[in-house]
Each structure stands twice: as C-alpha cells, then as structure tokens.
Amino acid sequence: MSRIAYIISAYKDAPHLARLVAALDDRADFYVHIDLNADIHPFEEALGDKVTFVPRHRISWGGWEQVEYQKELLAAVLHSGIPYTRVVCLSGQDYPLWSNNAIHRYFEEHQDTEFIGGFNLTRCTVKQQLHKITHYHPFRDLPWKSIWWKNKLIVASRKLVQILPIRKAPFAPLEGKQADVYFGSDYWAITLPCARYVYEKLCTEEKLVKYFRTSFVPSELCIQTIVFNSPFASKGLLLEGEYPGLTRLTPLHYIDYGASIRVMTLEDLPVLQQSGKMFCRKIVSGTSDRLVEAIEPVSYTHLRAHE
C-alpha cells in the first residue's frame, strides 16, 4: 500500500494548516517545520500529535535557511524508517484540489516520475535569471530583529554587487566537477530513493552548499541542481528552450505568481477546477474560507475521463 510523507513549512495561520492536514489525512504522515520567527504554540494546539515537528530555523525569504529546513524535514522522513512511496513538499498555505484516492492512484501510476521541475540556468541567455547565481546575494540569513535595516542592507549590497566586477561562475561544484545549475519551484513530489539521494548530497557536498549560500532563493536552485545532475535526472520534469517562467516549473500546484503570490478566493474556483493541478496556493483563513468550502476534490475517475 502506498504511503505519502508530506513535508510542510509554515509560519502563520495555524487553523488553515490544521485544515490542510485534515484534508490529506489518508495513508499519509506529516512532518512540519515552523519558522523560528513565529510562535509555535498555536500550531501545537491546533495539530497536537497529528504531525511530527522538526527542529526549527529562523527563515528569511530568499535565504539559505529555506534549504536547511527542507533538509531537516527530509532527515525526519528518512530517519522514521517508514518506506514511503512519495515525499511531497508543501507550504502551510496550500490546499488539495484532488481527492486523496486520486492523489495516491496518480502517484502509483507514475511511480518512477520525479515531480520536480528543472530549467538549465547555466545555459540561460536571460541575464536577470542568470544573475541569481552569478551575482552574490549575501545577508539574507542575518538574524537581525530589525527587518527594515536588514532589507536596507540587502538592497545596498545588491546595488554594490552590480557595480563591482565580482561574479560567481554559473556552475556549481558537485562531486568534484562543475555542474550545470537548474532552477525550479521548491514545491515538488519525489520518490523516497530520490529524497535520500538529495539528503545525502546536502550533508556531504560542502562546496555545493557554500556556492548556493550566496545565491538568490537557493531553495529554487540547490535541490533542483542535485536532482538534474543525478541518476534521477531522466525521471524529472526538465523544461528546455526559452526561459519558461516559474508557473510552468511548478508541476503540481496552481499558483498565481506575480510580485507576490495572490491569495485565492471563491472567484478563483472555475480556474482551479480547470487547472488540472493537484494543489493550489495561497489559501488564507477568513479570506479563502468560502473557496475551501466550495472545492469538491477531483476524483480518480474524473481524472481518467479527462486524460
């Protein structure tokens, strides 16, 4: 029987996280990271023993600590000793559009597929995208209490880096070689062997870690680079050609990307129903309640009928 490990990051809205866990609680276990900047008590009260909480990291968007909490979650899954068939990475503001039976059946039918998008950034001709790795992006993980001063420092350093002739190579050191860097969404669903491979590389490839510590949003780069330079590469979802954008690189989620991710409301229901996606984001308690109540999870039979 298939069993899924859901690894989830959250920093607010404990009631919705409890709702998400309840919706997916079928042949599944939940491993949760709560940002150290947040109060964990509402999450403990809302979830109790329904989830496994992992050691916490202080998260700054776009910083290396986002990869560290993913590593923490993978460690908990692997050390559990449970032979999961799939490890699914979610945020605490996701919600399923499919029934649990449909999710399990779909993964069973695609048991060798690694649902992680990848685009070769090393070969990319769009300078703005290439700068994610060739420009240094320091200071994002500084544990400053003043977000205002921290953001000022980040912006100033970014402008300085654009002026100074200091660049990183568009290759990441991996297994003693210069590996192409791949970019994709940090929400994915990979097999347990692939998850183990990723975790081992995060533990042993010190030069790789050092390289990505100063990259822009390494959670969209590091694990993708490991997978697409691994024996699992042919099973991943590689996009070639022109830069496709993050929407196409997010295989299982419907997300309205923009300057910031848009909160979903009842008005988005028709689009979500037609998207064919397994999950949606961003769901917020209060604002999205009517949408969640209106979602009728897509059945496995419905999926097969529309293939």
Report residues per predicted region:
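Short, acidic, metal-binding catalytic loop of nucleotide-sugar glycosyltransferases
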Residues: 20-29
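Conserved small/polar residues in nucleotide/adenosyl-binding loops
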Residues: 301-307
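Acidic donor-binding segment of Leloir-type glycosyltransferases
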Residues: 28-55
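Catalytic core and acceptor-binding pocket of nucleotide-sugar-dependent glycosyltransferases
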Residues: 150-261
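Active-site-proximal specificity loops/subdomain of glycosyltransferases
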Residues: 50-80, 84
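Short aromatic/hydrophobic "clamp" motif used to bind/position activated sugar donors
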Residues: 87
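N-proximal low-complexity "stem/linker" segments adjacent to membrane-targeting elements
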Residues: 1-8
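Conserved donor-nucleotide/metal-binding helix-loop-beta segment in metal-dependent transferases, i.e.
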Residues: 100-126
